[in-house]
A protein has these predicted regions:
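Aromatic- and acidic-residue-enriched segments that line the glycan-binding/catalytic groove
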Residues: 19, 23, 39-63, 123-143, ...
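Long, low-complexity, polar/charged, intrinsically disordered or flexibly structured peripheral segments
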Residues: 71-78, 235-256
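An active-site-proximal structural segment forming one wall of the substrate-binding cleft
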Residues: 104-110, 114, 168-182, 200-221, ...
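N-terminal structural segment of carbohydrate-active enzymes
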Residues: 11-185, 193, 256
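Active-site-proximal helices and loops of the catalytic beta/alpha 8
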Residues: 176-184, 194, 202-209, 264-265, ...
């Protein structure tokens, strides 16, 4: 009994331990679409804009040149007469995985030893925070966008045994290998509070209505009545943003089949060849809007991740308690060793802004000390 208790205690402490490598990490964050265009042959096209805001079909469109003035409208942007902020959402620069690989030596020379990638999973948006799927890297980040689509369409999204590796996936796995060959680490963004409108399960609900087996994945307020000309389909989006359908939860977090899907995603990217050695996989996750997902789910998520890779690092985005009044969460409940190793420290950033950037309402050193 004593041996069993000691063993359980050791397992619990291993799960709670922050990986040593993370404590000395010098991070570099990469927004893939805007980092470097390493392969112009895979650049987004006018067709790849479909499925994200703005939804208007464009008669003309082109990749934005990297060195152009951010506020300068391109000829095609001037023709649609919609202004800067509308067109900024349509812009694509062609950044991709090859572009990241090309600059790894440069990053290493800077002293970087850990990379955090904003979302890389398939998505119509430039930011990729509204996923179309989690099982594949965005096809415009890899060398064969058309071939990747053929592979997606041959799979059962719920059955990992049917999942294959696309050209974009394989290039991403090469990126992981190249990162590890330089004694660097890599983590990726996990967005599991919401998805994009083209997400495969949401589209199934949209097409089949109440007959869809994925109805309980989302917060559906009303289904469409085919007997009427109106579309009554209504659902909840993240912070009311209907571009990002929100995942349903109860007091324990998302439902069982969604959890099983995410568990399979964790295993896929944590140990791609499934041999029990996680050295070919990612080194952790940054979890988006983590405070909006139940802690019970994140406790399970941590166990899944650490079962695959005991040295994996988890950091959560724990941000607004009251968005309208700029009140942020105290992140302590997420940092007890059973959920995250760290959080995105927005409270620190906010204090720095108030002390050193905000000249109008600049706080005093004593006030900064209190905030810290």
């Amino acid at each position: 009994m004593l041996v069993w208790l000691l063993r359980c205690s050791s397992v619990q402490s291993d799960i709670a331990k922050v990986p040593e490598w993370a404590q000395d990490a010098i991070w570099y964050q990469i927004f893939p679409e805007r980092f470097r265009n390493g392969d112009p042959s895979n650049d987004p096209t006018i067709e790849t804009l479909e499925g994200t805001w703005p939804y208007d079909k464009q008669s003309e469109w082109a990749i934005t040149p990297w060195t152009d003035d951010w506020y300068k409208l391109q000829p095609w942007e001037e023709k649609n007469a919609q202004g800067f902020y509308y067109n900024a959402q349509l812009r694509r620069y062609g950044g991709d995985i090859q572009g990241i690989i090309d600059k790894l030596d440069y990053l290493q020379e800077l002293g970087v030893n850990a990379i955090y990638l904003n979302p890389v999973f398939e998505s119509a948006s430039s930011h990729k925070y509204g996923a179309t799927m989690y099982r594949h890297i965005d096809n415009n980040f890899g060398p064969d966008p058309a071939g990747d689509i053929e592979i997606w369409n041959s799979e059962n999204p719920t059955d990992p045994l049917t999942w294959q590796w696309t050209a974009a996936d394989r290039l991403f796995l090469k990126l992981i290998d190249e990162v590890h060959a330089r004694d660097m680490k890599i983590i990726i963004d996990g967005v599991f509070n919401h998805v994009g409108i083209p997400f495969w399960a949401f589209q199934d609900v949209r097409q089949k209505g109440r007959q869809s087996e994925y109805c309980d994945w989302f917060i559906i307020k009303s289904f469409d009545d085919p007997a009427t000309p109106e579309d009554e389909f209504e659902y909840q989006g993240w912070y009311g943003v209907t571009d990002l359908p929100e995942i349903w939860e109860d007091e324990n977090g998302p439902g069982q089949t969604f959890r099983e899907h995410i568990h399979n995603i964790v295993k896929r990217w944590g140990d791609p060849n499934g041999d029990g050695d996680p050295s070919d996989g990612i080194d952790g996750w940054r979890l988006d809007v983590a405070e909006m997902v139940r802690k019970e789910f994140w406790r399970d998520f941590r166990k899944w991740v650490r079962d695959v890779n005991p040295e994996a690092y988890l950091t959560g985005e724990v941000w607004w308690k009251d968005f309208h009044n700029n009140v942020m969460f105290n992140a302590a409940p997420w940092l007890q060793g059973d959920i995250f190793d760290a959080v995105m420290n927005y409270r620190f950033a906010d204090a720095m802004l108030k002390a050193f950037v905000d000249k109008k309402d600049q706080i005093k050193p004593s006030q900064l000390d209190k905030l810290l």
